Amino acid sequence: MGCFLVMFELYNPEKNYTKIVNKIVDSYPDHIKLFKFNWILKSDSTRYDIINDLAKLIDNEGVFIVIELDSLHPSLWATRGVSTAINNWLIKHLS
């Protein structure tokens, strides 16, 4: 089993992906590295670059990532369908 890199945001603990992540952390404690951090995104181009990098990680390395954004305005998380895309990926691969 690959190593899962889990980064979760704390703005709304009722989101579906948070429940999934918690379940995975409980089920596979030896395979998961848990990090918390804050990102400050200053431009759309930076945001897109980071999203593209995340997609490459998910596709090429078997890593899933949920981003902690509690230092940013919460609207950023919903922008461009990022939360939906990550949540859908988690459900597809891990449910």
Question: What do these predicted ranges mean?
Answer:
Residues 1-41, 45:
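Extended, hydrophobic alpha-helical segments
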Residues 21-28, 42-95:
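Charged interaction segments
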